[in-house]
Amino acid sequence: MPLDATTQLVTLLGHPVEHSLSPRIHNTAFRAQDVNAAYVATPVRPEALGDAVAGLRALQFLGANVTTPHKEAVLPVLDEVTERARAVGAVNTIVRDGGRLHGDNTDIAGFLRPLEERGGDALEGAPMLVFGAGGAARAVVYGLLSHYRPERLTIVARRPDQAEGLAADLAAHDPDGALRVSSFEEAALSVRTSRLVVNATPLGMAPDRRGQTPWPNPVDFTADHVVYDLVYTPEETRLLREAAAEGATPIGGLDMLVEQAAAAYRQWTDRGMPQAAVYDALRAD
């Protein structure tokens, strides 16, 4: 659909944004459904974030996505924030409703949906483990605590203080006392005895970290494991390849990427995203 005077705009606020796949995802969806909207990525330095958000309101943008380094800093400049976004302390989606801007975090739903589609109910109450303690891990840990009530949820990080901070921040959402913290050096038993293992670190991401893995001991995986890597480039990481060779069920990060985008797309357009067209576009290269 050609752009015209009624085209609605959506943008990505971040710095840098050149690597983002979000414009490809959403513009593919808009075209597939003849939605008169366009998605652009906008580099915004931290000191300009307030002005950028004010611009969304003044220019009547349909909404926006928010990425590094603004996911936390954007909360106080929005009119309303969902409970889940406030719980994890991060917003990745903004929706304009009249003159008000609402913030949400669709990373949580985006992470959970691929698990649910692969029989995730069997993970209810199971022991789990997450590699990483950054922003991605925060959404993952909150989602697992709220949806699966794991018997044990171990956060494995190279910086124990960061993992301890994450556990403390989410303690209010851990009524069963499931959260544990471990170093990589002490995590072997937790890896072996967890039903779900999630990589929420950049290890394995192309180009700079391709071939790296958070867990170089694949013999610790079995057919009882579900191994979920949030890395989406390449689509099959070393972690997933090695875990699958041991019989584990692999889930790649491309599914989460599309699902979190679909959750935002629905809020902006009140439509389901045409995911088959989006996957085709992402895999075209």
From Swiss-Prot:
Active site: K71 (proton acceptor)
Binding site for NADP(+): E83, G132, A133, G134, G135, A136, L230, G253
Entry EC number(s): 1.1.1.25
Class of this enzyme: oxidoreductase
GO terms for biological process, alphabetical: amino acid biosynthetic process; aromatic amino acid family biosynthetic process; chorismate biosynthetic process; shikimate metabolic process
Superkingdom per UniProt: Bacteria
One function term, GO molecular function aspect: NADP binding
Main function: Involved in the biosynthesis of the chorismate, which leads to the biosynthesis of aromatic amino acids. Catalyzes the reversible NADPH linked reduction of 3-dehydroshikimate (DHSA) to yield shikimate (SA).
Binding site for shikimate: S20, L21, S22, T67, N92, D107, Y232
InterPro entries in the record: Aminoacid_DH-like_N_sf, NAD(P)-bd_dom_sf, SDH_C, Shikimate_DH, Shikimate_DH-bd_N, Shikimate_DH_fam
GO-annotated cellular components: cytosol
Name of the molecule in the record: Shikimate dehydrogenase (NADP(+))
Cited Pfam families: SDH_C, Shikimate_dh_N
Recorded family membership: Belongs to the shikimate dehydrogenase family.
Catalytic activity, as annotated: shikimate + NADP(+) = 3-dehydroshikimate + NADPH + H(+)
NCBIfam families: aroE, PRK00258.2-2
UniProt keyword terms in alphabetical order: Amino-acid biosynthesis, Aromatic amino acid biosynthesis, NADP, Oxidoreductase
PANTHER family found in the cross-reference section: BIFUNCTIONAL 3-DEHYDROQUINATE DEHYDRATASE_SHIKIMATE DEHYDROGENASE, CHLOROPLASTIC, SHIKIMATE DEHYDROGENASE
Subunit structure: Homodimer.
